[in-house]
Amino acid sequence: MGKLIKLITTLTVLVSLLQYCCEFNSGSISCERTQTLCHYTNPRVWNTYFSRNCELYKNKVSPGFDIVARKYDTAVKPVIDDATVKVNKVAIQPAFKVIHSQCKKWNCGKYYQLGRSPMVKTRRFFFAKYNAFVKPNLDKFFTAEFRSHLKERILKYKNIGHYYFTITSRCIKSKYDFTVGNTEEKLMGKFKNKDTHGIHGSVTREPSSEDMVLTVSTMESDEEELTTTSTQTVVETITLDQEEASAVANHAHDDEASTDVEGSTDVNVNEQALLQEDFDMWSETILQKTQDVIQLFEKDVSKYINGKLVEEANHFKAKFQSLDDKSKKFFSKISLAINDIECVEGIDSETGKKIFFDKSGSTEISQYITRELVREYFNETRSTLDELTNAMEKDLSEITDEIEKKVNAIREENVEVFEEWGDIIVNEWSKRMAYVDVINAHMGADDDTTLDEEKAKSSVNWKKFLKGKKQIIESRDKLAHHSADLSRVNAFRQKVQKKILSFTQESGEFLYILRSKANLQFQERERKERERKEREKAAAEEFQRQQELLLQQEEEDEEDVSYTSTSTITTTTTMTL
């Protein structure tokens, strides 16, 4: 909330200053964009617009706005105008006169020469550190898409800043011209009015911003396209040699002119000295850059491996859970079949077919459990679990290969970044050395001894340059063959393999136990069946023996009946006789 209040306050102050400048320079503003900006930031314009289009605003807000505007025109604005005139008369005009008079006398040549050398050295130091530490991270995180969006935003805010800068600069320039006249013509007039055979001028035009088209809405919501304008900077360069500088120096002190001429030679000497000093820093920069790229490579690999292993750990956790659930289903199926080995046989009263019940005789089972059926269950369980564990091992191998490929891709990416950095560094150094050689060739000393020394320095510098280039190539090879830390990947793979092996052993042992239990159950059932068959056989034999005894007894009974009948007949016959 505090930031929002600050933003609103800042915008209010800027708009107020803009409106004051627009009112103060209402007759001297020629830029159509500035006129448009003044028009659409004027509160009176928006008050008129809202009053015309909104009844609520017209009845509630507009009367109060009119009262405030009248009070501002009668009470505030006259005070501000009087204060502005007084400040302009008392402070601004005398200050500009003093500054203008001092600018005529002040020659910045000596200060420029004194300050340029350390500034150049500092700039190159920061440039080297930027390329070594900052640029790789920027190249990594600032993608092409992000850069395009950033460029659009920068261009947008650049245009807005350009508007305010143009308005401010024109206000300042109008005040300055009003106070002391056109100082540029006063300062440069004496140079341009002289004979120009000793001065060679060149004018270049460099665009400072792209052409822009601004479309605004008028009060009647009509669209008006303003003329495309282009802001350009005109740079005027005056090149002086030693003889020509003496002609110009008649308007300044002789010692200052000689200082300027000698300063050009000092610049070249400083360039050679800086070049020799920077070669030592270059080697250190290459080593530091190599270490930084290696650290970035290891950091990227570590970050990728951490994320990948966490993801795959969750996947394998789900796979092991699925494997455990399926194994439990198979084991439960086999255990149920083993329990049903000792079943009870019955006869269906309706169909007359055999049906089977569990050993309690209360629950009917789907089928009779045989050795072949249980053996089929065991084979199905073993083959299914083997397929699942083999698939997990295959997935583990594919994940390992994927990680190795990604690590190689990260290595190649970092190597390409280093190669790009090395190419840029080598090109910049070669351009710099070539520039120094060209300067020395055209502005070298007439003394042969000094010329030989410069040539020797150039030769030494080129040898150092070649050494640095070879160092970059060696560092590139070192990066290309730098091994990544895959210990966590190996540990993860060993952990998964160990868990798979443990599951295989446990499932094998459990299946062995179930197989032994099934064999015991089948042996017990077969023993009982043999005993039952023996009992049935003995019962059958006993029944047959009983039948045979009954038949024999019946035969004996029949013989007894026949003997009794014969005796009776004989006795009867005898008595008759």
UniProtKB/Swiss-Prot annotation:
Any one GO CC term of the record: ribonucleoprotein complex
* Signal peptide coordinates: 1-23
Transferase keyword on record: no
Source species, domain of life? Eukaryota
- Give the record's family classification: Belongs to the SHE10 family.
Q: Where is the composition biased (Basic and acidic residues)?
A: 525-545
Q: Which organism is it from?
A: Saccharomyces cerevisiae (strain JAY291) (Baker's yeast)
Q: Which GO terms describe its biological process?
A: sporulation resulting in formation of a cellular spore
- Stretch list, region Disordered: 525-577
List UniProt keywords, sorted A-Z. Coiled coil, Mitochondrion, Ribonucleoprotein, Signal, Sporulation
- List where Low complexity composition bias occurs: 562-577
What subcellular compartments does it reside in?
Mitochondrion
Task: Indicate yes or no for the key word Membrane.
Answer: no
Function according to Swiss-Prot or TrEMBL? Involved in spore wall assembly. May be a component of the mitochondrial RNase MRP (MtMRP), a ribonucleoprotein endoribonuclease involved in the cleaving RNA transcripts to generate primers for DNA replication in mitochondria.
Q: How does it assemble?
A: Component of the mitochondria-localized RNase mitochondrial RNA-processing (RNase MRP) composed of one single RNA encoded by the NME1 gene and at least 31 proteins. Absent in the nucleus-localized RNase MRP (NuMRP).
Q: Which residues form a coiled coil?
A: 379-416, 513-561
The name under which this protein is listed is: Outer spore wall assembly protein SHE10
